[in-house]
From Swiss-Prot:
Bridged cysteine pairs (disulfide): 29-107, 41-110, 53-123, 109-114
Organism placement in taxonomy: Eukaryota, Metazoa, Spiralia, Lophotrochozoa, Mollusca
Protein name from the UniProt record: Con-Ins Q1
Serine amide modified-residue sites: 130
Molecular-function GO terms, alphabetical: hormone activity; toxin activity
Pfam family, one: Insulin
UniProt entry tagged with the keyword Signal: yes
Amino acid sequence: MTTSSYFLLVALGLLLYLCQSSFGTEHTCEPGASPHPQGKCRPELAEFHETMCEVEESLQGGTDDARKKRGRASLLRKRRGFLSMLKARAKRNEASPLPRAGRGIVCECCKNSCTYEEITEYCPPVTEGSG
């Protein structure tokens, strides 16, 4: 192997290492990890998630008119649906003998402090009729 080939191989390896270390910043959680001081947990997480999804929906072309007409009852139904979904998912995960990946909305936003982009990953897709 020539010196230039060796140098190119080392440079490529270093570049791959830098890309992996800078882009691999996903949150992970250990079992029993304590909540982050700026993390949002339980009802606060549900409220934050709902608010951020509504912001994301309005940014993607949804309107606030239908939401104002539906009123607070619709928000409570959405929250109850979200919480029941989380409860069902938790029960499935408890019954599963396989280890969990350690990444989810609770890991990213309660055990860690999540960004706007991270929490909106968990929002339902915006459709034309959802505005």
